[in-house]
Amino acid sequence: IITLFIFLFYQSYSLIGIVGIVLAFWIISNNVIILFQKRENLSNGMIVAHLGIGLLILGITGSSVWQEEKIIRMKVNNETNIKEYNIIFKEINEIKGPNYFALQGNFFVYDKNKNIITKLKPENRFYPVTNNFTTEVSIHTNLLRDLYMVLGEGNLNDGWIVRIYYNPLVIWIWIGALTIFLGGLISMNSNLKKLQRLS
């Protein structure tokens, strides 16, 4: 049911996506069941680590199969869409940092019900000491996706190049990696206790 919900939500049915999501939830569900059954012959650390592998596969599948990128030139008050989000370029401001000057874009992100979700503020920075230009990405994250915005070159007359990235399930890559690490710590602690009992 959860797998079907994910496909309906992202509106994509690629073979790689199907295999990845089914495999991920098979690993996750099996290890959750085993963990609650508390089988004495199985290490809790190993079960937790395997659970992390399932979460990792979930994140990698989502971020590689359903990612979307949009590159567009926008002027202030222009709007664009990516997936279910409407993005409005509200304003551009000059700001001064401790060792840089920057142009900061202010973008409002709305959902399909016209509720504001977040404000993204990507920057285009100039460091006079090193004579370097850099871009500062603005990110909004939740459990279903990451939304990135990058402000490129431009001016008030022609507008600015804006890069928008929609990356689903990215946070589950990090949660999966941390869960694998936690499983390793649990196994290490369990092995140390066994050694102490034997000594």
Listing of model-derived features with the role each one plays in the protein:
Residues 1-82, 87, 172-199:
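Contiguous transmembrane helix-bundle modules in multi-pass membrane proteins
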Residues 39, 46, 66, 93, ...:
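Residue-level detector of functional hotspots within protein domains
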Residues 61, 92-95, 167:
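Short beta-turn/strand-loop junction motif enriched in small, turn-promoting residues
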Residues 70-160:
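Soluble non-transmembrane domains of integral membrane proteins
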Residues 161-175:
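Juxtamembrane/start-of-transmembrane alpha-helix segments at the extracytoplasmic/lumenal side
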